Amino acid sequence: MKAFCAFFALLAAGAADARGTVVFAGGGWAAVDRGDVCEALGRSEKIAVRGRVQATAGFAFAPDRRRWGEFHARLSRVARPGSSVILHVGTLPFLLVARGDWAWSSGPVQEQAIIDAVRGGGRMGVEARDLGGVRFTDPYVLEGAATAIDSAAARCALRAAGKIR
């Protein structure tokens, strides 16, 4: 597991290099400052095979506060139109808004509830049905998630206050 976490931190750092600054990397999560948005990002435990989409999840924070803790997930498969996409954090379910292979939280109240649930630790999974009607789940470990969320939020708050450029 430690090798996986170290590998993820390296991947996050490399990916962020081209598109932002890594603020934190630990556990299975990283916080990245992209200038117009700061994100806490995690990768699914299921590693995508070559040519397939890697499932990721994250929380977005914008200095102008248009988005503050917005949850988003890139699904490993395209969700069947009209089907439910549900985020499970521990035993708590959250119905997400979805289009194609992306899903989002539905607003500030749900976003805060998701962040509170993530702080409780444990596991997280995004469940949906693919175009063929087959149910799938993209699982995530939450180790490092709370720190990544706090780091991303703090970084964007500093940017909004003019403390960093």
Explain the meaning of each model-derived region:
Residues 1-7:
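Sec-dependent signal peptide recognition
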Residues 13-15:
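N-terminal signal peptide c-region/cleavage motif recognized by signal peptidases
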Residues 17-165:
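A generic "folded-domain core" signal
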